[in-house]
Regions:
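Conserved segment of the thioredoxin-like fold in thiol-based oxidoreductases
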Residues: 79-121, 128-131
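Bacterial Sec-dependent N-terminal signal peptides
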Residues: 1-25
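N-terminal "domain-start" segment that seeds a small globular fold
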Residues: 17-49, 109-110
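Short active-site neighborhood of thiol/selenol oxidoreductases, capturing the structured segment around
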Residues: 46-64
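Conserved hydrophobic packing residues within short motifs/helices of P-loop NTPase cores
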Residues: 57, 87-89, 135
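Short loop/turn microsegments at loop-to-beta-strand junctions
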Residues: 28-29, 55, 131-132
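Thiol/disulfide oxidoreductase modules built on the thioredoxin-like
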Residues: 107, 114-160
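Conserved redox-active cysteine motifs that mediate thiol-disulfide chemistry
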Residues: 59-76
């Protein structure tokens, strides 16, 4: 019994240290987002549009207090790292709330609405447990920051400097 408990503990330790993914899976890449104009686009087409550039993905919602409090930090990043593409993926409860939130909080960047939010293929892939959530995709199209919840997190800043 002791050996089984020990092996189980070792397995759990190993799994908790697993490396985050460096590429989106096929289901996430094929997930559908909605543009401000109302068009449907896939994550793959969004990323291909910015191939060769560093991308910050901000997963947020207008109802999220932490997201709104974090906006000044995002705006500071945008001011300092002007060559970076900023994508905002909204988990708002509806398109109108999403659009109002963008205007109300003067969020600058490219905006996309995720209709199925956490229940989408993208939501499953990134395992959204908290927002805001920030990710960084490098110029080689690799996910180099998978999960930070503060826009001034050292991991995020380091990735933008590279």
């Amino acid at each position: 019994m002791k050996k089984i408990s020990y092996l189980l503990l070792m397995l759990l330790s190993y799994l908790s240290c697993a490396e985050p993914p460096t590429q989106f899976d096929e289901a996430a890449l094929n997930d559908t987002f909605i543009t401000l104009e109302g068009s449907k686009v896939t994550l793959q087409s969004i990323l291909e549009k910015h191939k060769g550039k560093t991308i910050v993905i901000d997963i947020w919602a207008s109802w999220c207090g932490d997201c709104i409090r974090g906006m000044p930090k995002v705006k500071a990043l945008q001011k300092e790292y002007t060559d970076v593409v900023y994508l905002f993926f909204s988990l708002d409860k509806g398109i109108e709330a999403w659009k109002r939130g963008i205007k109300r909080y003067n969020v600058e960047g490219e905006h996309y609405y995720l209709p199925k939010a956490k229940k989408s293929a993208f939501g499953d892939f990134v395992n959204i447990s908290w927002i805001p959530r920030y990710m960084v995709i490098n110029k080689a199209s690799e996910i180099v920051v998978f999960n930070v919840i503060e826009a001034d997190d050292n991991k995020l800043i380091k990735a933008l400097k590279n």
